[in-house]
Amino acid sequence: MIALLCLSSLFPFSFMVKHGNRKYLCTFVNMKTFVIAGCGRLAGIVSEAVIKGLLPEYELVGVYSRTVAKAERIAGRMAEAGKSCAVCTTADELLALKPDILVETASPAALREFAVPALKNGTSIVTLSIGALADDAFYREVCETAKENGTRIYIASGATGGFDVLRTAALMGKATARFYNEKGPDALKGTPVYEEALQKEQKVVFTGNAVEAIRLFPTKVNVTVAASRASVGPEAMQVTIQSTPGFKGDTQRVEIRNDQVHAVVDVYSETAEIAGWSVVNTLLNIVSPVVF
């Protein structure tokens, strides 16, 4: 038994123990540790999934936010559930925990800050801020660093999906793709395109490619870059953004065509919660024997 307990830290395995007339199946699971950078609403969904037992093969060991109170709130919830979670005040402190995975739910700027150091640290990344990967030079650096260090960067689907069919259609050749996003005018406040007239009239506020879109809306259209990286690339992905008075939530519609396939992935979400749950799904896929 002592030998088995020692081996349990190396890999998951099961064995049978007989006690009297009863037999018990004992399973040791190799737990993965992860940390979160960015402690807003989406990070809260992921941490609550841990608390509710939806991620049984994971241990959340640390959280980091530029607003320390937000990190403390998540760590406090973990403590209430009897789970230890460190509040980190710097990126170096977070990576010093040597997590298997870094979950990034902050911003493209945060991904730029964390990606290369994390991958060199032996830490794979699950990210929602895919907009940072529109930059080809940064994208290549991330890919090369991951290869050199045996790590990976997992792109969560966020508020869209269908990356498998997008990639498949693109691999077949001669593919074109376009992305359509509809949102309410309030969601555009603070951006260069916002004007009060949008509160009363429907208007296309942007047309261009995914690189131009993420440059103009650095936190609003990460999904366009994700869909483009799964298919035709950020320069070739054509993007249209429409503002509709009174519209709540987001419609994300990506369309891809080649000589044989025409596919449309159309997702409406009233809130951003689907993005947080897409991280939970990605984490499950990483450890699942069956991957969707």
Predicted regions and their residues:
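N-terminal amphipathic/basic-hydrophobic helices that include classical n-h-c signal peptides
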Residues: 1-30
